[in-house]
């Protein structure tokens, strides 16, 4: 457009300078500037033929390559989504198993505490019963020993009384003789 404007300016200046010969020369130049109808038509037909040939030769392979590339990209996107879904599922499963493991561990700890407390209670109860039996046995033994000592003491006292009475009977009973017999008896024993 700019070229055409420059040419028309030059043409106007030349026309005004030389009106006769230059005018004809300019008309010839303008005519050669634009193609003729047969040339224009031949160029247009050649262009359409080139476009059609390129269309049939290049369009199908390019379209096929683009379709293959599009399928490859879509396949990768689908695989990525599938992998992402699988990894989310596995993560959820792992979290679920971890929560179950924590729950199991808490349950085991709780059961262990309960079992430990029951074992402690059982052994405490056994120890109390055993100590109670030992104390009862000791009381029984003490009572038995005390009773034995009382019986022995009674027996000894009875024997002593019999001995004293025998000795007193052999002698005349006076207060002094009785005291003397008791002293002698106690010295012997």
Swiss-Prot record:
Primary location class: membrane
Record keyword Transport present: yes
Highest taxon above the source species: Bacteria
InterPro entries with a match to the protein in the record: ATP_synth_B-like_membr_sf (IPR028987), ATP_synth_b/b'su_bac/chlpt (IPR002146), ATP_synth_F0_bsu_bac (IPR005864), ATP_synthase_B_chain (IPR050059)
CDD domains: ATP-synt_Fo_b
Subunit structure: F-type ATPases have 2 components, F(1) - the catalytic core - and F(0) - the membrane proton channel. F(1) has five subunits: alpha(3), beta(3), gamma(1), delta(1), epsilon(1). F(0) has three main subunits: a(1), b(2) and c(10-14). The alpha and beta chains form an alternating ring which encloses part of the gamma chain. F(1) is attached to F(0) by a central stalk formed by the gamma and epsilon chains, while a peripheral stalk is formed by the delta and b chains.
The protein, known as: ATP synthase subunit b
